[in-house]
Amino acid sequence: MIENLSKLISEKVSSELNYDNERKEIIQYGTYALIQTLISIISVFIIGLLFNIALEALIFLFTASILRKYSGGAHSESSNVCTLLGIIISICIGFLVKSSFFTKMNFEIIVFIGIVIFVFGYFIVFKFAPVDTKNKPIKTEKKKKRMKKGSLKILTIYLFIEILSIILYYNLGWSLVKSVMLSIILGVAWQCITLTYIGNILLKTIDSFTNKLL
């Protein structure tokens, strides 16, 4: 369905602007990716609203997705399965962050977990990123360096958000800060895991199981 819609849009645009086949394929790929992204965001938002976990699930989704854009990582063989897994994992993380285990957790422990995850994150990104796939190979060394640099910049932005959250918590006592911090921490952790061999095996296992169900 998504593929047919993106193909229809690309053909319409290419026809109107008199584009060649190469440009048409680029438009089709971009449209396909955009539709999948919108489906993920809207699905997570609606399901999140139903269970009062929209903020946590969306923060996790955006955190992992933005870092993934630069760092790459293991992918499902099917883009549809990949989208479905992203939605499911985001919702599960939303429930986890809102669980009594984390809501009752001491703030200093959350800060400690954050420190550990960011040290782990910088190490993994510096060592492995960007991780390409068969479908999306990174062909030039220049692009690899640019993507690694982008990954480190994104990770640093997340770190500054965490530091700002800590300052806000201690100065204003905003309890919402805990949820925001945990969602970012878990988003960083998950994306960095997908850059590793273990993450690749894990996603392949989930992918195989999901394909059998579908």
UniProtKB/Swiss-Prot annotation:
Its main location: membrane. It is found in: Cell membrane. Its EC number is 3.4.-.-. GO terms for biological process: proteolysis; quorum sensing. SUPFAM superfamilies: MFS general substrate transporter. The keyword Signal does not apply. May be involved in the proteolytic processing of a quorum sensing system signal molecule precursor. This is Putative AgrB-like protein. It comes from Clostridium perfringens (strain SM101 / Type A).
